[in-house]
Swiss-Prot record:
Membrane-traversing stretches: 223-243, 294-314, 319-339, 354-374, 390-410, 448-468, 480-500, 524-544, 556-576
Cellular component per GO, a single term: membrane
Classification of source organism: Eukaryota, Amoebozoa, Evosea, Eumycetozoa, Dictyostelia
Gene (name only): phg1b
The protein, known as: Putative phagocytic receptor 1b
Cellular localisation: Membrane
Source organism per UniProt: Dictyostelium discoideum
Record-level GO BP terms: asexual reproduction; cell-substrate adhesion; phagocytosis; protein localization to membrane; secretion of lysosomal enzymes; sorocarp development
UniProt keyword Transmembrane, yes or no: yes
Amino acid sequence: MRLQILLIYLICIIVSSIVLVESSNKHHFKENDEVPFYVNNVGPYSNPTETYEFYTLPFCKPSSISYKKTKLGEILQGDSAVLSDYQFPFKSSFENKQLCEYTLKKEDIEKFKKAIGEYYYAEMIYDDLPIFSFVGTVDDSDLTNIRYYLYNHIPFEFDYNGDQVIRVNIDTEHIKVIELSDQDEITLKLTYSAKWQPTEHEFSKRMDLYEEFFTKELEIHWLSVMNSFFLVVLLTAFLAIMIMKILKNDYSRYSKTDEEEDSDYQEDYGWKLVHGDVFRFPPYKNVFSAFYGIGWQFISIVCGILALSLFGMFYPNNGGNMYTAGIVLYALTSGISGYQSAKMYKNMGGNKWAWNIVLTATLFVAPLFIVVILSNTVAITWHSTVALPILTMIEVITIWLFVGFPLTVVGGIAGRRLSENFEAPCRTKNFPREVPPIQWYRRLPCQILIAGFLPFSAIYIELFYIFNSVWGHSTYTLYGILCLVFLILINVTVCITVALTYFQLSMEDHKWWWNSFINGGSTVVFIYMYSIYYYYYISHMYGLLQATFYFTYMLIVCFFFFILLGTVGFYSSLIFVKRIYRNLKSD
């Protein structure tokens, strides 16, 4: 375990160097220096995934289209920034500068009306700072005469400190509009202005300004998290005391039974009765081992992502650093999955080593690949910028083929050779004991409801903020809270899974291996149900493109956390079961 923690630490250092934020030395300017101004994407405000290139709308284009050089993470998040004709020399203020003047045809007017009616939202970039603005506004107070207004003058405000840009904003109070009437042609004149003003904010903290904007409900947020934290502490204490008290009584009863004379001998009962079967390995050893190994890899990835977030790697408009970090972490931690999977597989007496490695390497990647192909096909049909270019897909596949898969093989070989034999406190009998009939409310489906609901209830408030960030326009920057919530989730999962495993053994049901894994991961059932509720009743998302991305990628996210939490549930149950049977004197 210490080796794994050290490995995660080293990997985080490597990832930090790969996705490191550009040095502030590249953001120094002299007065009147030209700073490139990029226009990125446009799309419906309600559908954050449905984005299109800026010039799919009939704005006046530059004489030649020059795309901004993009990193892997920027491509994955659908960025398609183009150098525009806007010119903002450093520290140079001006009024009503003309961008262009041209004629809108009938079809161009209809395109703008459609975009304004769907609340199209545009993103622009200046010195790596994001600028957001609607395309126009609509007056629908009279439904019989809806009027559309296009922004034709945008006033920009710039804050600077010395020779560096600190913030860029749009003065919404002084935006000018032009009505898009039903004429066949409209002459459109686009203008803009710039106002530069000094500030005391430091460049190194310029992203804090965006964090302040996006965290107005910080106090409510912290209050809800602390409420969940204290509830979890009480739940953990209650379950721990209850289990310890029950186990103490069990040990006392079993000790009395062992001390009785042969004439008064009583047959074992409860969880002691299944001591000869409790360490009998489950069916589908290869699949179970693969899940287990991948689960440890995912735990490492989440810990790495959280560590990088606390180091300030993921700030607003960070060029897709989180996507890049996720891919690099997945590739570099593949050895962990191979090692843990092979180690468990050897303990179970498996001998199909090649199949074990292949299954470990593809059990998550294969469903992910199917989802990417499906969603990418829809995005290409819609001509959206979220459609991944073929070269990008080849690049990601190459990373997996030449880094991820080989590390899985190396980890598998190491796990096979370095792992020790499985040490069970009790000897397993030759023939499995028949499981007695169990009441319906004690069976696995009911266990799933209990095991999934309690961890979900501890995190559902945080899910709202996470969903607003991932599937909305909010920016999540409270990574300290996220770490705390993750620890709460792990803690509740451990407590509930261990308790359910004990009750299952008490009913003389020794088939706890798969049950503990499924119970641990059952929280994702409620997470996916919440995602359905969020889509239809909280968000305003619509359309096939957005729905395809939303529901398919939520399936993958839930599958990810099913494996992660399932591994946590099983591993904690394994430690618990070993402990109680080690303390029991068995015949």
